[in-house]
Amino acid sequence: MKKIQSLLALLALLLPVCAAAQEAKELTADCAITSGKVRTASAHDNDYTTAWRSERVRRPYLEFQLPEGETAGWLYVCFAEMPQSWAVEEKIDGKWQVVADGSTDYIHALVELSGQNRFRIVENSGIATRLKLNEVFVFGEGDLPDWVQRWQPTAAKADLLVLATHPDDELIFFGGTIPTYAVEEQKNVVVAYMSYANAARRSELLNGLWHMGVRNYPVIGTFGDSYSTSMTEMYSRWGRQKARGYVMELIRKYRPEVVVTHDKGGEYGHGAHKVTSDACVYAVENAADASVFPALAEQYGTWTVQKLYLHMGEENVIHMDWDVPLASMGGKTSQQLAQEAFLLHVTQQKTSYVVTDEGRTGNANFSLVYTTVGPDIVGGDFFENVE
């Protein structure tokens, strides 16, 4: 019995060691990272706001040389601009050879390697261009840290579409919506944006969503980021048909049962938020009519949304409780997760915006402005009455 107890005690001591041995070591700081005569520090300074770019040439690259005896198991690339085509190459017998073709599906991309010591990222479209990166990270073999993103495709069919104008709007104005439904309730949630503002904020967007437990890649629109209090002016800048068509495509392509978007007054009067809200109402009301944007109807079919909620409002208002602990996220509340995610929007930390359910633009009140399943009676759940 004593021998068995001693063996069990020894195993208990060894288990943490085994677990630790499986964790991938970050090797970025150990690498010699080069790209011809171009300085590369901004590609690996842990600052998403200091984008790195190569020379403008055919096949621009960023090369990594690990110390002797060290090998790479993973390469995590955060692009500032998606290349037309790219790959990871290894030098074998004096020649660069492709070891992994890069995907253009995700702006933050993870590549599994197989013990390379010297390798490079290369843009291989054949045209003269620049390689533009926000950050790169190199890891050895093993289990990656939780913050490294390995995105899955956008859900083919949405239960819920969350439509925000800019990065961080989904946190400030919609509070715990995303972690509550995408993670705790395990709904198919499509998070979509009209604009990503700039490359740094797009990376912050992804970092924030990932922190909240989102694993399906968002839809990131390309409308320009500018300010006006006028909805008419913003429609002029974005194009009324283009903005409405973008939202209509989201609805017909992803077929959500419920849609959540901005206050019709633009939250604090922002014209771009007003356009998002107005275009969303238009698209929801007309998505079942094949004569409206007929090309999209032919491509995706028509669709009938069951419920549309706008942030705030004065009629048919429900209050969402974002302070309920989520078992799926270790007991943190969805509001806490949204607040933590907002901290990852580093460029916005000097603004006056906060993630809270208090105040005039608090993120807990929503108005039901369109429904095919009747009014909310109980409240507190976007999916009340949804079939």
Residue ranges of each PLM-predicted region?
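Disordered, acidic Ser/Thr/Pro-rich linker "stalks" and the adjacent N-terminal cap
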Residues: 22-72, 78-86, 90-97, 101, ...
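A general structural signal for short secondary-structure junctions and capping/turn motifs
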Residues: 2, 210, 250, 297-302
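Sec/Tat signal peptide C-region and signal peptidase I cleavage site
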Residues: 17-21
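The feature marks non-catalytic terminal segments
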Residues: 23-24, 28-51, 152, 181, ...
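Bacterial N-terminal signal peptides
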Residues: 9-16
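Bacterial N-terminal signal peptides that target proteins for export
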Residues: 1-8
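Active-site beta-strand->loop->alpha-helix modules in alpha/beta enzyme cores, enriched
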Residues: 81-84, 92-293
